[in-house]
UniProtKB/Swiss-Prot annotation:
<dbReference type="InterPro" id="IPR012292">
    <property type="entry name" value="Globin/Proto"/>
</dbReference>
<feature type="binding site">
    <location>
        <position position="97"/>
    </location>
    <ligand>
        <name>heme b</name>
    </ligand>
</feature>
<keyword id="KW-0813">Transport</keyword>
<feature type="modified residue" description="Nitrated tyrosine">
    <location>
        <position position="25"/>
    </location>
</feature>
<feature type="binding site">
    <location>
        <position position="65"/>
    </location>
    <ligand>
        <name>heme b</name>
    </ligand>
</feature>
<comment type="function">
    <text>Leghemoglobin that reversibly binds oxygen O(2) through a pentacoordinated heme iron. In root nodules, facilitates the diffusion of oxygen to the bacteroids while preventing the bacterial nitrogenase from being inactivated by buffering dioxygen, nitric oxide and carbon monoxide, and promoting the formation of reactive oxygen species (ROS, e.g. H(2)O(2)). This role is essential for symbiotic nitrogen fixation (SNF).</text>
</comment>
<feature type="modified residue" description="Phosphoserine">
    <location>
        <position position="45"/>
    </location>
</feature>
<keyword id="KW-0597">Phosphoprotein</keyword>
<comment type="subunit">
    <text>Monomer.</text>
</comment>
<dbReference type="InterPro" id="IPR001032">
    <property type="entry name" value="Leghaemoglobin-like"/>
</dbReference>
<comment type="similarity">
    <text>Belongs to the plant globin family.</text>
</comment>
<keyword id="KW-0963">Cytoplasm</keyword>
<keyword id="KW-0561">Oxygen transport</keyword>
<keyword id="KW-0539">Nucleus</keyword>
<dbReference type="Pfam" id="PF00042">
    <property type="entry name" value="Globin"/>
</dbReference>
<keyword id="KW-0944">Nitration</keyword>
<dbReference type="GO" id="GO:0020037">
    <property type="term" value="F:heme binding"/>
</dbReference>
Length: 147
């Protein structure tokens, strides 16, 4: 099954909703990550020395990058049917940080929960599936670059 124009549009519109309140949704995203995997705190330099998730420029920048990469993956999936990493260092960075398969699952769950929150009454199973497919393609590309 190919990624459709409608799926790309759903990802793009909810990406815009996410960006409209980046501070709030960044904190929400990392709070969900740490609720699901408290040990993941050590993977993020901007979280290591704080008792709880707090808004910061680094936190926002990283959240924007994660969600932006998934959005870019949606665009690539629609255009080419696959995802090629624009940043060749992503695999090495994830290896250096000690990222393993279960971390990708946690990030996916947190990402989908955050998008549901950001989309509000525009959320649907179809929107969720579009983000899920785009995230899975990105995660596959990162894992490939890690090996």
């Amino acid at each position: 099954m190919s990624f459709t124009d409608k799926q790309e549009a759903l990802v793009n519109s909810s990406w815009e909703a996410f960006k409209q309140n980046l501070p709030r949704y960044s904190v929400f995203f990392y709070t969900v990550v740490l609720e699901k995997a408290p040990a993941a705190k050590g993977l993020f330099s901007f979280l290591k020395n704080s008792a709880e998730v707090q808004d910061s420029p680094q936190l926002q920048a990283h959240a924007e990058k994660v969600f932006g990469l998934v959005r870019d993956s949606a665009v690539q999936l629609r255009a080419t049917g696959g995802v090629v990493l624009g940043d060749a260092t992503l695999g090495a960075i994830h290896v250096r940080k000690g990222v393993v398969d279960p971390h990708f699952v946690v990030v996916k769950e947190a990402l989908l929960k955050t998008i549901k929150e950001a989309a509000g009454d525009k959320w649907s199973e179809e929107l969720n599936t579009a983000w899920e497919v785009a995230y899975d393609a990105l995660a596959t590309a990162i894992k490939k670059a890690m090996s």
